[in-house]
Amino acid sequence: MFKRKQFDELKSRITEPRNKIQVISGPRQVGKSTMVKQVLAESTIPHLLLTADNVPPSNTAWIGEMWDTARSQMKLRRAEEFLLVIDEVHKIDNWSEAVKKEWDADTYADVNIKVVLLGS
C-alpha cells in the first residue's frame, strides 16, 4: 500500500490533544480521501467518516446534524475521544461558519471530538 508523506503527519496529529481542526485540501483526485481512510484503518480512535458529495449546497444544517451523530456515537461507545471526518466539506454553503459553531460548542462543553475536514 502506497502511503503519502502526509500520512504520518496526520496520524500523529489525530493523537494529539484536541486544539485544532485538521484541514486537508488540494486538487481533486490526488489521494486525500484515500490517505485519510488509510490513517483511520490504523487508528484506534472511534470515528465517523462522512462525505458531503450528495448533500444539497444549501443544507448547511447537515453539518450540525452529523456533528450531533458523532456526539451520540461518542456517548454510546463511552469513548474519551472521537474523530469526525467530513470529506468534500467545501460543497456546503457557509460550511466554515457551521463548523466553527459546532467546534466552539464542543470546546465550551469539553467534548473531545477531533475533526478532519477534506476539500478541494
Residue ranges, per PLM feature:
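Phosphate-binding site recognition
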Residues: 1-120
